[in-house]
Regions:
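C-terminal helix-coil-helix/basic helical segment that borders enzyme active sites and/or dimer interfaces
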Residues: 22, 26, 35, 49-106
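Glycine-rich phosphate/cofactor-binding loops in nucleotide/flavin-utilizing enzymes
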Residues: 1-7, 98-154
């Protein structure tokens, strides 16, 4: 599950996004120079660095016999897929109206890779177990919280 959005691949996409933000302009200025876009990028960068640290923690935990990394992997899956979707979504926003194009438009940038990957990670969020289900599993199994009560007659 954790390999669905490896942090090093995510950092590579961040670097590609930074390159895109240097090329795309708004009011004659590259988007990387606009505080709102730059702030969103920095938030994503911080999350990726945290994910890389978490991945190293999981790797070192595997070296210690008896260490359970199941919950850590669930957290990695949850945060990894959500983060990739957020990152690809920023790229869509950076491209403006061209970011909304999909499939066979002659105006696509990078053959529509950003749009495809955006939808791919949306599918992983849904298909790999919705984020809410993942959060419930982490809460119940990892934190020992009680299961949600069942409503009678529902």
């Amino acid at each position: 599950r954790g390999s669905l959005a490896p942090p090093d691949a995510t950092m590579n996409r961040v670097n590609m996004l930074m390159h895109l933000m240097k090329k795309e302009t708004l009011d004659g200025k590259p988007l990387i120079e606009h505080p709102i876009y730059r702030d969103r990028l920095m938030q994503i960068q911080g999350k990726v660095l945290a994910q890389q640290s978490h991945a190293l923690r999981l790797l070192s935990a595997k070296l210690n016999p008896g260490t359970d990394v199941k919950i850590g992997k669930m957290i990695q899956k949850l945060t990894g897929t959500e983060l990739r979707h957020e990152l690809e979504g920023l790229a869509i926003d950076v491209m403006g109206e061209i970011g909304t194009l999909y499939e066979d438009s002659p105006h696509l940038k990078n053959d529509g890779t950003w749009q495809f990957i955006y939808m791919y990670f949306l599918g992983l969020i849904i298909g790999g177990g919705t984020s809410q289900i993942q959060k419930n599993i982490i809460a119940e199994r990892g934190l020992g919280m009680p299961k949600e009560p069942k409503v009678e007659g529902a």
